[in-house]
Each structure stands twice: as C-alpha cells, then as structure tokens.
Amino acid sequence: MAKDIEYNETARRKLLEGVNKLANAVKVTLGPKGRNVVIDKKFGAPTITKDGVTVAKEIELEDALENMGAQMVKEVSTKTNDVAGDGTTTATILAQSIINEGLKNVTAGANPMSLKRGIDKAVTAAVESIRKRAVKIENKKDIANVASISANNDDTIGNLIADAMDKVGKDGVITVEEAKSIETTLDVVEGMQFDRGYISPYMVTDAESMVATLSDPYILIYDKKISSMKDLIHILEKVAQAGKPLVIISEEVEGEALATIVVNTLRKTISCVAVKAPGFGDRRKAMLEDIAILTGGQVISEDLGMKLENTTLQMLGRANKVTVDKENTTIIEGKGQTKEIQGRIGQIKKQIEDTTSEYDKEKLQERLAKLAGGVAVIHVGAATEVEMKEKKARVEDALSATRAAVEEGIVPGGGLTLLKAQEAVAALKLEGDEATGAKIIFRSLEEPIRMITNNAGLEGSVIVEHAKTKKGNEGFNALSMVWEDLVSAGVVDPAKVVRSALQNAASIGSMILTTEVTITDKPEKDAPNPMAGMGGGGMGGMGGMM
C-alpha cells in the first residue's frame, strides 16, 4: 500500500492539531466543577461521563496524521490510568501544554534533543518535590477524603470505600458490581471464601436456607479424588470419636465414599460436608496450600508420599467456623500459625511483583486478599442504567486512587502540588536549550490549577498568580470557592497519581517534540463500479426467456 510521508514542521503541526482536539475534549472534565461529556453509542443510551480516560478512549479522528497525535496523548491517559488508576485528565492537560510550548520553541529554532534533556531533568526535580510533600495515610478519614475527591466529591462513595478498606485491610480485595436496587451498599466477606459449594445437598445443616454451618470443624485437604470408602473410614472414625464435624476439600468425592458420608450425615453419626477443591492445575495446588496454612493443616498429597488411609488428626486443619452453600465455601478464623500465614503472604507478594501477566497478577491478588483479611464487594445502585454506569466508573476510579494513596501517600490537591513543584524546577542550573526545556515544564506545572479554576467559572491566571504567593498547603478550593489549607479541608490527591501524570505526560511530550517524519497509509480511492455503465436496459434481451 502507498504511504504519505510528511516532514519537519508540517508533520509536527498536524500531530499538534490531533493532540489539541483530544485534549480539549478531555480537559473540560477536570476539577470539582468539571463538565460532563456525552458520548453517542451505536446501540442503547448515550454514555455520560466526567472520566478523562473514558472520553479519550472514544476519540478517533478522520485525518490519519491528526489521529496519530490524538492516539499518542490517549496513551498518556491510559498509561496513567493503568499505573495509578486516576489522574488521566491531569496527565492529558500536562501533555498538551508540554507539546504546545515545546513546538513553539522547536519552530523558533531550538534543538529538540536539548529540549528533551531539559524536560527530563525538570521532571526528575518536580517528581522529587512531589515525593517530599507526600504524607503517609494515617486514618480512615484520609482514605475517605481521597476516595471522595476521585469520585467527583461524592462523600457517600468516599465513606463506603474507607469502610471497605478498614474492614479488609490494604491487601484485601475490593470489587465493584452493579446492584439490583437504587441503593449503593457494601458487603464484606470475612475469612477465606472460594467458589465451590457442597457436593451433595444432603449435607446441609439448615434445610430452610440450604446452608451447611459447621462449628470448630476438622478440615481434611486432599489433592486427588476420593472414591473408595476404605481410604476414608479410618479418619471418619477418629473425627467422630473427637465429637467434631469434618469438612473434606478434595478434587472430587464420588462413589461409595460419597454414599457413606451422606448416609452417616443423615443418621447424625457424624456431621460432614464435602467440597470440591477450588481452581485448576497448578493454581489448585497453590490454593490448597493456602487453605492448609490458614487452617494449620497439611495438604495430603501422594506426590509427597502421603496416603489418605494413614492420615492423623494432627494433619487436619482447624477453623472456628465453616459455612458452605450451593456455590461458595467460607472458612472463618482459621487456626493456622500467624508466622506461617505472614510468610505465605510475603511469598505471594513477591510473586505479584515478579509476574508480568495481568491475569496472573489478579489471581495472586485474590489469593493474597483471602489470606490477609477478606473480600469486600461494593454494589453500585442508581435509578437508571446510564447513571449506574457513570457511577460505577467513578467508584472504580476512587478505589484505584485510594490504593495509590495507601502506596505512596497523599499530597495537597487542586493542582497545588504541581504548582509548588515549580520551585524545584526553577532551582535547576541549566543553560541554552536545556534551560528552555525546563521552562516548558515550569509553565506546564501551572496548567492543571488554571483549568480547574476555568471550569469553576473563574479566571485561571489570577488564581495561579495568587496561589504562588501562598505558603504551606494553602490553596484555592474550587468546590467551596475559598482559600484555605487544602489538606485540612480534605482536598488531597494520591502522590502516585500526580507523579505518574507528570512522568507520562513528559514522556509522550518529548516523543512528539523529537518527531521529524510521519508515515501514514494513503487513503484508498474507491474502485470504479464495473456495473455502473450498463444502464437499465443492459440485460433486456433476457425478457424472452419467460
């Protein structure tokens, strides 16, 4: 296919037009008084959003060169969203400013590579300034503040996320689902839950709710099928003598083994529930090991030379309570050694750091949560489907921002931290075009506060100049429209979000500034229609065939 090749100024100018088209659509959403963007969908109702990355993802431009510029800035918002979960609009605004200011200087004759070096040095200084201002999150109120701001100043969402994190801990899993009602609620599953229910309904202890609840049971963990009764009879007798219930977790329980368990349970000789092991393959082995460590038992594995008929009570796990329904099993307060559980948690954290697969990371995170504290589910409710989708996106944003805040701490929000980072950039001793590169970053750092203020209906330049004279954490609160200590007022951002936004914006900005040639596919001309010249009477001679 033939290609269009553009050079120098022509190439950069077209890229810039694409950058501005995308950024101008995204930046109206910034701040507490940011506006909505309505996105048309081919099917169903339009999407209404104030989430920068959602807007960016929808934009495809007709002109191939402009679209390249837009897609490069889209990469800024998606990368920031992947790393920090929020800050996508801020990243887009910073990128737009860096590219616009940078291209002015390149057109005026500045060396793009020297500009890039200056930009990189300025960003390093600004990031260090952000890190120094960061304060570790100490309490539930700080978490609620971060979550509320990320959810567009929705205190209800902020408090729900703070409650969830308080209950499951910072390593716990918090998931977001659509509710069946208009209420937004929080459900917390304490202990370890996995998605396998009882093998037979005859094992339930409460026929009305169809749930088996066993108090202080022994837990047999076996990695193969159990089908022969002689393998199991020995351990069933020992558990019955101890007067305790038994939970069997194995690949499968079938045949005479299952029949014996059901008959003895119905006769009340022993209270026993059999459950299939969770997961598949290597993940199943790892999850069985997790359960064993949580309950203080051992995985009875023939790979290790162990036999089911030789199992003793000391090899079985223990827990305060186990509840099993048709679909889920929950182990509450396993009696494993704290030291061993912490060791296992450390091992899983190391695996999370080492893995490159997002799927593996997600599954490891789930295992970690089940060992560390539990799982919380936020059910998002709303009056209409359009509102629910918009609200769910805000909750997911807020959740990601909160995790980022727990990781690297919080800084004053409202664009103030980036503005204050100007001092670190100004202190750099650079010369020539490198100094110009640093000035580009210096100017860009005030752009978010300018846009937040513009969206609130005020003159951004006036607020920016006034903010530069303020000391400490005092800044402009665009929600209440007053000057105050932003941290005390709860206007805070996760340091990781602010840092990632700046680094990603500078990365793409530098790439566009140092672009000299663009290559795009030539638009294909429509091929002539071979039937076009035949006219209506072209096949008239066929009339006699009737």
UniProtKB/Swiss-Prot annotation:
Q: Could you give a GO molecular-function term held by this entry?
A: isomerase activity
* One Pfam family named in its UniProt record: Cpn60_TCP1
- The Gly residues compositionally biased stretches are 533-546
- Which reaction(s) are listed as its catalytic activity? ATP + H2O + a folded polypeptide = ADP + phosphate + an unfolded polypeptide
The entry marks the following residues as binding ATP, namely 29-32, 50, 86-90, 414, 477-479, 493
One Gene Ontology BP term is: protein refolding
A single GO CC term for this protein reads: cytoplasm
The protein's matches in SUPFAM superfamilies, at most eight in alphabetical order, are given as: GroEL apical domain-like, GroEL equatorial domain-like, GroEL-intermediate domain like
Keywords in alphabetical order, please: ATP-binding, Chaperone, Cytoplasm, Isomerase, Nucleotide-binding
State the residue spans of region: Disordered: 522-546
Under the heading Gene3D superfamilies, the entry gives:
GroEL (3.50.7.10), GroEL-like equatorial domain (1.10.560.10), TCP-1-like chaperonin intermediate domain (3.30.260.10)
Q: What is its EC number?
A: 5.6.1.7
Subcellular localization is given as: Cytoplasm
Protein family membership: Belongs to the chaperonin (HSP60) family.
Can you state the subunit structure given in the record? Forms a cylinder of 14 subunits composed of two heptameric rings stacked back-to-back. Interacts with the co-chaperonin GroES.
| Task of the protein | Together with its co-chaperonin GroES, plays an essential role in assisting protein folding. The GroEL-GroES system forms a nano-cage that allows encapsulation of the non-native substrate proteins and provides a physical environment optimized to promote and accelerate protein folding.
Protein name (database record): Chaperonin GroEL
Q: What gene is this protein a product of?
A: groEL
